[in-house]
Amino acid sequence: MHISTDGKAVLPRAHTIPHYALYGDNAPAGWSNMFNFEWIPERSSLYEWEIQPHLHGAFLQVLFMSEGEGHTLLNDSRWAMRAPALVLVPAGHVHGFEFNPRVNGVVVTAAQRPLESMAGVVMPELMQTLRTPMVMNLPEGGRHTEGLMPLFRAIEREWRMPAAGQVAAGLSLLTALMVQVARLNDTLEPSV
């Protein structure tokens, strides 16, 4: 990613921005459960801690940085992050990341439409959160911040251990995560 003299991110032309299910994977997503879970270092270290601008046509991503610092490129803006930080990237938004090698945290990629369908039934006002890109540097020890990691760990367990009802449980946990994101958005001033 290149930065102009005024601090704005300079993106390549729209037709050159790659589309991925997961960054760097050219094959279509093969997940039968509609979501993926990764620790940030798993993929970022393979790319020297820089994830170039790209987008996901049908997937949203939630990144929670629990340790370290970095920058998020979201559409045409670049945002500084320091842990704890949360980034929500709805489907169709160009994004990229630069991390320091001491970063840790999680990334969940999920099919946006099924998540929106579930939200539409259980909490229609959650749709705005699901469709709004955001970068938030979070307060340490805040009650909503503290509620994030247990949800991410539950999502990880569900993703790593296939079982009957995995899609239902996964979407339910992702919906609970999005409720926490909405609460954080209501109590904090997001960067985006």
Predicted regions and their residues:
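A hydrophobic/aromatic-rich effector-binding and dimerization subdomain
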Residues: 2-34, 98-160, 178, 183-187
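Hydrophobic/aromatic-rich alpha-helical bundle segments in the mid-to-C-terminal region
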Residues: 49, 188-191
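Short beta-strand His + acidic residue motifs that chelate non-heme Fe in jelly-roll/DSBH
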Residues: 71-73, 89, 95-101, 107
